[in-house]
Amino acid sequence: MAAPSLVLFRRDLRVADHPALAAAMAAGPTIGVYVLDDTADGRPLGGAARWWLHHALTRLAADLESLGVPLILRRGAQNTVVPALARDVEASGVYWSRRYTPWGVAADKGLKAWASEAGITAQSYAGSYLVEPWAVQTKQGRPFKVFTPFYKAMQAAGEPSLPLPEPEPQEPLLLTVKSDTLADWALLPTQPDWASGLRQTWQFSAGERTADFLDTAVNA
């Protein structure tokens, strides 16, 4: 079997319209990775964010499994966890969607530097916005502060790329490396269980409400 690639998931917990996942699976066997770094941006996740993360990762794991892609969960600092995992699975490359916060950019630059030294591929992709933040700027090369000029500049930039479909499934990978479980992370509230009503209004319900809004409010 060819050496696998790692795809790092952060906030982009989906399989459709995911350029990094599509590129990795086109290159060969692929392993999904999510690293829970509690203080990466200087503060721990709040209760609602932890609840969302639990259910988003549950859905992501199921969606990846349908594509033959395992999802490995690890806790710790990204730039410590990922190199160790890459060595364990003898990865040939690491793929991810770009981040734009100062700490995210710095961490990902460090990851690319490690990959270069290790002699493996490191590829980042635009997977979060319609356009990169620096692609639409004022004539002075600065971010817009007023909506109307920004809107006109976006219109002049042309149509954005169409969303990518889900990749074609690969042959399922059987791994022996260790993965945390969501139960290990204890992300869900217990006492009080304030999230009980949210469990009935997850992605499917959101899709129904969006379709209803488009039919009644937009197309009316």
Please name every model-derived segment.
Residues M1-P160:
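Trp/Phe/Arg-rich N-terminal binding region typifying the photolyase-homology
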